[in-house]
């Protein structure tokens, strides 16, 4: 457990101890109803669902420890649930914005590298860590495939679009390298995630995208645009390398948002009065 988590848990248990004292009891003597009342009181204090979940997690860990050491007979936290945190929808670029971003000029220093990096990022929906770790041996430009090692050491192959293939070929011609070399080299080995983030911010402003653009935005945009065009949730899950399809389902909400906008703009009974 990290030092940051330990500090957070210490604050959570201190808050619970203070509340228990106000109720003329102590941590060891708390009943489930009292612990539930504590969580409700914290909710009324407008603690976020995420903070409440962490607070309850600290309580569960503490009472598991007491149970293990014979200080209590049962955990009062065992059956208590905190309010679920609302899941934020990921931000995405629309198709025009994504195209504008990746079509950076190639006749400037590092232009071919930047074009290849952005085209591949958007074309294949890679994670930032996967993109940075790429070696030329991982790319098959003739077949249009890139093979990456994702989370949980799971390997997957993802298609590479024609624009990305052309950009990568131009970049390799500009800077020849053997098959074991990084596709996007940095100062000492592969380019770092931080370097990609900084470069992306620079390029976004240069391309006229005056919004917060971060590396994962291209992966979100890839997923949203492929799902919008295909409607194949399972296919998008495999392309992204998600172990659980529930993780991919967040993009169906984005697709619904798009459909809702189309409906509002096109349906004769949905148009707003001016």
Region annotations inferred by a language model:
Residues 1-274:
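Conserved catalytic core of the tyrosine transesterase superfamily
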């Amino acid at each position: 457990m990290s030092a940051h988590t330990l500090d957070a848990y210490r604050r959570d248990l201190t808050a619970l101890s203070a509340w228990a004292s106000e109720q003329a009891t102590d941590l060891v003597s708390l009943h489930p109803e009292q612990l539930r009342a504590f969580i409700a009181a914290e909710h009324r204090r407008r603690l976020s669902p995420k903070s409440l979940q962490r607070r309850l997690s600290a309580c569960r860990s503490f009472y598991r420890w007491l149970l293990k050491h014979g200080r209590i007979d049962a955990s009062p936290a065992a059956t208590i649930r905190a309010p679920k945190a609302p899941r934020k929808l990921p931000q995405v670029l629309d198709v025009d914005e994504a195209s504008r971003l990746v079509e950076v000029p190639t006749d400037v220093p590092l232009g071919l590298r930047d074009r290849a990096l952005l085209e591949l990022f958007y074309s294949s929906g890679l994670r930032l860590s996967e993109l940075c770790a790429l070696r030329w041996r991982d790319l098959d430009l003739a077949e249009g495939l890139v093979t990456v090692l994702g989370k949980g050491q799971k390997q997957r192959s993802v298609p590479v679009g024609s624009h990305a293939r052309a950009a990568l070929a131009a970049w390799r011609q500009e800077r020849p390298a053997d098959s074991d070399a990084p596709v996007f080299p940095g100062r000492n080995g592969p380019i770092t995630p931080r370097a990609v983030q900084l470069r992306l911010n620079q390029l976004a402003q240069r391309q006229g995208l005056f919004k917060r653009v971060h590396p994962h935005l291209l992966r979100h945009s890839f997923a949203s645009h492929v799902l919008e065009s295909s409607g194949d949730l399972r296919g998008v899950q495999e392309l992204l390398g998600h172990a659980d399809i529930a993780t991919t389902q967040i993009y169906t909400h984005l697709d619904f948002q798009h459909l809702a906008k189309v409906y509002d703009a096109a349906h004769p009974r949905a148009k707003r009065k001016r």
